A protein has these predicted regions:
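Conserved interaction-surface patches within small, structured recognition/assembly domains
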Residues: 69-86, 97-101
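Short beta-strand elements
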Residues: 58-68
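Catalytic-loop motifs flanking and including active-site residues across diverse enzymes
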Residues: 88-93
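Long, amphipathic alpha-helical coupling/dimerization segments that relay conformational signals between
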Residues: 95-109
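C-terminal binding/interaction regions
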Residues: 106-156
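Short Pro/Gly-enriched beta-strand edge/turn motifs at strand-loop
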Residues: 40-48
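Charge-rich, low-complexity N-terminal segments
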Residues: 1-35
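Short Gly/Pro-enriched turn/cap motifs at secondary-structure boundaries
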Residues: 50-54
Length: 156
């Protein structure tokens, strides 16, 4: 069984079949779709984490919505990106919003980061090592924060 949620596994599989130049073109195409991942006006979120970190060139906001009941709760991410965010971060945002959509919190937390070089290629991982993992790290942090807040409310 794949360690990746099915939608992310399909994206990884697509990239693995592409030569390097087509991988870059496909990454640019995903980056162009990043605006579709932005938070929707008048939609409420269970967790919002907007900040500027050292690892990224601009502010990134992670918006987490959890639907359903335990143990089948599903996560839905929206991400706001500042205007200075790099193309690779935009591409990873789009890939992760699509690839992790409707996964369980637990599945998101278990996603190994080894899919990143399979998508972007080894060269870009070396050159942009912080950038390519940044959005995944933030999404996992949002899931952990949601679970911690939920535990505190249950124990409080």
């Amino acid at each position: 069984m794949s360690a990746y949620p099915p939608k992310l596994a399909a994206i990884v599989s697509l990239f693995e079949g592409l030569p390097e130049d087509e991988k870059r073109e496909t990454l640019i195409s995903y980056a162009d779709q990043a605006a579709r991942c932005a938070p929707v006006e008048n939609e409420s979120y269970d967790l919002e984490d907007v900040r500027k970190d050292e690892e990224c060139t601009d502010t990134v906001g992670i918006f987490l919505k959890v639907t359903g009941a335990n143990p089948c709760r599903q996560v839905h991410f929206r991400v706001s990106l500042g205007p200075q965010v790099q193309i690779l971060t935009k591409a990873m945002t789009s890939i992760l919003c699509k690839g992790l959509d409707s996964s369980t919190i637990e599945k998101v937390l278990e996603v190994p980061a080894d899919f990143v070089p399979r998508i972007v290629g080894g060269q870009l991982v070396r050159v942009r090592s912080q950038t390519v993992y940044y959005v995944l790290t933030r999404m996992k942090s949002a899931c952990r924060a949601f679970l911690n807040r939920e535990r505190s409310a249950a124990n409080g």
